[in-house]
Amino acid sequence: KNGRRGSTFFFSTTAYDMARRIQDEAAPATIPLYVGHDTQTDTIFPLFQAWESENSVSRYVDLLLAMLAATASQGLAAANSEPAPSLRAFVEDVRRHFPPVDGSRDMGGDIDKLADAFGAAVMGDSDAFGLPKLD
C-alpha cells in the first residue's frame, strides 16, 4: 500500500532459502567408512548426524510456517479484510506474536518468536493456534 514503509515482501526469498535447507537436511544420514588405515573397519555412527538434521529441519519448518502465516496475516491487514470465521482464532494468535506491519521494525525477531510459538504448540506445550494435543 502507498505510504506503508513495512513489508513482508522479502520473506519470499528467505522462505525459498528455508525450503532449500530443509531439502538439504532431510537427506538420509549415511554411514561413511573410516579410511584412516587399511586394517581399520570401524564406521562412524550416523545417529548424531540424523539427530542434528532432525532438529534443523524442525526449526526450519517452524520458521517457514511462521513466514507464511505472517505474510498471510499481513495480506489480510493490507486489504482491510477479515479472515474466514474458522481461521479468526488462528490469525489472532499469529498477530499476537507478529502484529501487522505498519512501519519499520525487526521482523526477523518477530518471526523467530512466532516460530518458537509454533514449535511449542506442535509439541503440546501451548494451547495457541488451536492445534490438537499429541498423544
For the regions a protein language model found, what residue spans apply to each?
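C-terminal auxiliary extensions adjacent to catalytic cores
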Residues: 1-135
